[in-house]
Regions:
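Vicinal oxygen chelate
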Residues: 1-2, 79, 83-123
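Short hydrophobic/aromatic beta-strand element in the GNAT-like acyltransferase core
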Residues: 10, 39-41, 69, 101-103
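Short secondary-structure junctions
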Residues: 28-34, 89-93
Length: 123
């Protein structure tokens, strides 16, 4: 098998319209299209996020506890912008010596992170 790349990241939600407002209006991701059966796709840079309600195909909903890291130019500025829009963060912004990270959740409890690597990657 040859994997070409990750095609999309699936984000399960309970309220698609509320999620659309959060991901598109609050986070500023680019809306692409509605998905038949309920849901939508939006873009974070070159990564497609497919946001949908799993209950539409009789699957249970459970929020994803594993962070989706959103790369931003300045974590402090992005955090201040989101806090101004009512987004609550889980903890102080972390400086790991390699990157800055700030953790938060979407309205359905899916884990998200603002991220910026500032140290060079090792070869």
């Amino acid at each position: 098998m040859q994997v070409e790349h990750v095609d999309f990241v699936s984000i399960c939600v309970m309220d698609v319209e509320r999620a659309r407002k959060f991901y598109v209006d609050t986070l500023g991701l680019r809306f692409d299209r509605d998905v038949p059966g309920g849901g939508f796709e939006c873009w974070a840079g070159q990564v497609c996020l497919s946001v949908w309600d799993p209950r539409t195909i009789d699957l249970p909903f459970a929020p994803n506890p594993n962070d989706i890291a959103l790369r931003v130019p300045d974590v402090a500025a992005a955090r201040a912008d989101l806090e101004g829009k009512g987004v609550e963060f889980s903890a102080k912004t972390l400086d790991t010596g390699v990157c800055h990270m700030a953790f938060f959740h979407d309205p359905d409890g899916n884990a998200l992170m603002l991220h910026r690597r500032y140290a060079a990657r090792e070869s």
